[in-house]
Amino acid sequence: MFVQNQLKSWIASIRSKTALPLRIELWNGQHVDLSSEAPRVTIRLPTVASARYLLNPSLANLGSAYVEGNIEVKGTAQDMISICNALARNTLKPEGKLARIVRSFTHDKNKDAEAIRYHYDVSNAFYEQFLDPALVYSCAYFEQGDETLAQAQVKKIDHILKKIQLQPGQTLLDIGCGWGALVIRAAQQYGARCVGVTLSENQYALARERVAAAGLAHLIDIRLQDYRDVTGQFDRITSVGMFEHVGLKHLPNYFSIINKLLAPDGMAMNHGITSTDPDNGETPYGGGEFIEKYVFPHGELAHIGNVLKTMQQGGLEVLDVENLRRHYARTCALWTENFEAHAEQIRPLAGERRFRIWHVYLAGCAYAFEQDLISLYQIVCVKAGRRSSTLPWSRNYMYAQDARPAPVLAH
């Protein structure tokens, strides 16, 4: 009776603050609607004990309860995330889960490899269900806004290669190469001699297969290797969706390594997710806690100001910064749509628990980018102190239609 009274009081409090298209189904068969609008989301509490997740509805608590099967939720992922954020926002105190907590973790080669395998080595077939055919698992670039996911991913890669002014025959290092889409494109379109490194065994195996199938083994070397173990120098370096795994304390060293690997007249691009909190705090309402526990162990997001500062500490000069937050919101929304459309195929590949984790994660990311809780920046940089005569004077070259040479045929 005590819990029931608490729940009744909580429902009254929420109703007094906002009208949500939410239905709560109780363990005794009764239900309560939180507005006169037809419910778009239903949360079922199977037991009296499960009411505690609503009484303290941080995203970590609600997400964990859904993943572990302690509550059931019906509705689209986008509606679920929006309503759960509203519950948290109207219940939690600012000094509690509402706060943007800063987390710091110990990073070394073994721990980083373990974290990467946890996230990326689900199965290639799993990722094939919701990514584009090239398996590009990073923010797409919607130049006009009406592109398909596949078109936008190709445009993203081309946008990057134009920004770094890749020239025919140059050497390129891609840190965190995924399934090889960027290095394959660079070799096909520019004849670039590429090295791609990843810590994911599944990515490594499939990327090598794709390189061989494209007839590009003479131009592309895919390695199962930590970026800290790479030697030599490269004309161009790209890092797309990787530096989030580096750790806040290690960013100066990360950029120092890029500086060391970059040729004197080289150019690099870092494309990564950032915190929108000036103090490098994680997403609010317990969202960051859920991501750390279930999705990205030891992931840390830096504010763009901190990224620029640590780049300079690493001996790099920033030439260009572009915010692609809205592009990632759309990318994640399309991934979520694909995920839900292929739910029947994904469940047996991932299992129910992992299916629920990713269902929440993808939609939650779309919401977080849309609400400016996190962001995405592409940063072009060079070794500090380059002579002006060796650098572009404007951004015009990035958008020139003839910026990319004719395709290079494999031989």
Go through each PLM region and give its residues.
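Substrate-binding/catalytic lobe of Class I Rossmann-like enzymes that use SAM or dcSAM, i.e.
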Residues: 273-389
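Conserved SAM-binding loop
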Residues: 207-208
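A short glycine-rich, Lys/Arg-flanked "PGG" loop and its adjoining helix->strand segment in the class I
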Residues: 252-264
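Conserved class I S-adenosyl-L-methionine
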Residues: 168-176
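Feature captures hydrophobic
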Residues: 1-153, 159
